[in-house]
């Protein structure tokens, strides 16, 4: 099979908002309309992002950036994110979400209930981008002109975000992770790791990889996106030990036997969590709250730390039994992290 080595990466909504905010601040302070801006990212890379439009008035400046999803099938591709900047009386940077930005209506998400759905990482990205321009106080207003309409086609409402889209992103970069070419890239990366290690750590996403890097050499960690099952099968033929390390939401799908965790392949996260919680003997009142939650993060707010550990141990044991069927001769290990990076369960390690 020929690998398409020119797969296009994209930018997250958070990166688009950061670029729009920086362009707006440059317009406000320098009266300059930039066609591109360069922003810092949490992973140390700098991104040059096109700016679609800049409007400058005496006391306010607005800029628009289009989200670009690369080769990912993404309904948000081409969505305009607009940021307006004006001076703030103090030296703080205040970030406000308005039209088209979703509002958080349930607990358990990264943004606090009642706030707009702008993640803490994105807020930090925006602040860092602006601080490259000025140390003055700035108020940034984020709008997504078509956000409310587009949000109806996403899963936002199911997790308690209403009225618009979420402004998210842990790295600023969107990786093409859902097609067959990507699986071939995984195969190649596994072969490279094999030259130096007899074990590999499989992490579904950026946060899992970050937390795993605190336990293992980062050079033996591979991010596999949704292709968890295929990656484990490939790795089981190459390594003596295969470690699956992830966060609860993704791994609850694997608990249910869903090895391609793309949303189109099924969900069962809360059903799986409820099932494991029953097996763990959690009280009926807690079970009711868990089953009625809109997200795993919300469900976790109803559980004590000890209950989380007990439930995730059951989840990890079941996952271990599932992946052992791929190759009985391999030492498999499952690690489940809490959302703050703490290890909730380690089975087979």
Curated annotation (Swiss-Prot):
Q: Which domain of life is it from?
A: Archaea
Q: Please list the GO terms describing molecular function.
A: cobalt-precorrin-5B C1-methyltransferase activity
Coiled-coil positions: none
Q: In which pathway does it act?
A: Cofactor biosynthesis; adenosylcobalamin biosynthesis; cob(II)yrinate a,c-diamide from sirohydrochlorin (anaerobic route): step 6/10
According to its UniProt entry, one GO biological process term is:
anaerobic cobalamin biosynthetic process
Tell me the keywords, alphabetical order.
Answer: Cobalamin biosynthesis, Methyltransferase, S-adenosyl-L-methionine, Transferase
Catalytic activity reads:
Co-precorrin-5B + S-adenosyl-L-methionine = Co-precorrin-6A + S-adenosyl-L-homocysteine
Segment forming the signal sequence: none
Instruction: Show the InterPro entries listed in the entry.
Output: CbiD, CbiD_sf
Q: What class of enzyme is it?
A: transferase
EC numbers for this chain: 2.1.1.195
Q: Record's family?
A: Belongs to the CbiD family.
UniProt xrefs under NCBIfam families? cbiD
Q: What is this protein called?
A: Cobalt-precorrin-5B C(1)-methyltransferase
Q: What's the source species for this entry? A: Saccharolobus solfataricus (strain ATCC 35092 / DSM 1617 / JCM 11322 / P2) (Sulfolobus solfataricus)
Q: What is the lineage of its organism?
A: Archaea, Thermoproteota, Thermoprotei, Sulfolobales, Sulfolobaceae
């Amino acid at each position: 099979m020929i690998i398409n080595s020119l797969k296009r990466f994209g930018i997250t909504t958070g990166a688009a908002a950061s670029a729009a905010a920086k362009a707006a601040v440059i317009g406000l302070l320098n009266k300059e309309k930039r066609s591109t801006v360069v922003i810092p990212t949490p992973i140390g890379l700098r991104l040059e992002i096109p700016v679609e439009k800049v409007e400058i008035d005496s006391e306010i400046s607005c800029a628009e950036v289009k989200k670009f999803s690369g080769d990912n099938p993404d309904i948000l591709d081409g969505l305009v994110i607009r940021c307006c900047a004006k001076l703030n009386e103090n030296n703080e940077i205040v970030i406000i979400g308005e039209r088209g930005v979703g509002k958080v209506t349930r607990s358990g998400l990264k943004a606090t209930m009642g706030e707009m759905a702008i993640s803490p990482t994105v807020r930090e990205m925006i602040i860092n981008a602006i601080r490259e321009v000025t140390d003055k106080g700035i108020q940034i207003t984020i709008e997504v002109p078509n956000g409310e309409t587009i949000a109806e086609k996403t899963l936002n409402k199911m997790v308690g975000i209403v009225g618009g889209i979420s402004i998210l992103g842990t790295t600023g970069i969107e990786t093409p992770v859902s097609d067959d070419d990507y699986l071939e890239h995984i195969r190649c990366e596994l072969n490279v790791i094999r030259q130096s290690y007899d074990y590999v750590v499989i992490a579904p996403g950026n946060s899992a990889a970050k937390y795993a890097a605190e336990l293992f050499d980062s050079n033996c960690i591979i991010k596999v996106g949704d292709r968890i099952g295929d990656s484990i099968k490939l790795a089981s033929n190459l390594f003596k030990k295969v470690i699956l390390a992830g966060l609860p939401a993704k791994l609850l799908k694997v608990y249910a036997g869903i090895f391609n965790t793309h949303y189109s392949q099924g969900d069962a996260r809360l059903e799986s969590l409820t099932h494991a919680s029953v097996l763990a003997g959690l009280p009926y009142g807690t079970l009711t709250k868990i089953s009625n939650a809109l997200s795993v993060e919300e469900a976790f707010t109803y559980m004590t730390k000890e209950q989380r550990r007990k439930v995730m141990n059951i989840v990890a044991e079941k996952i271990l039994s599932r992946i052992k069927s791929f190759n009985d001769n391999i030492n498999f290990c499952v690690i489940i992290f809490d959302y703050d990076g703490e290890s909730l369960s380690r089975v087979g390690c």
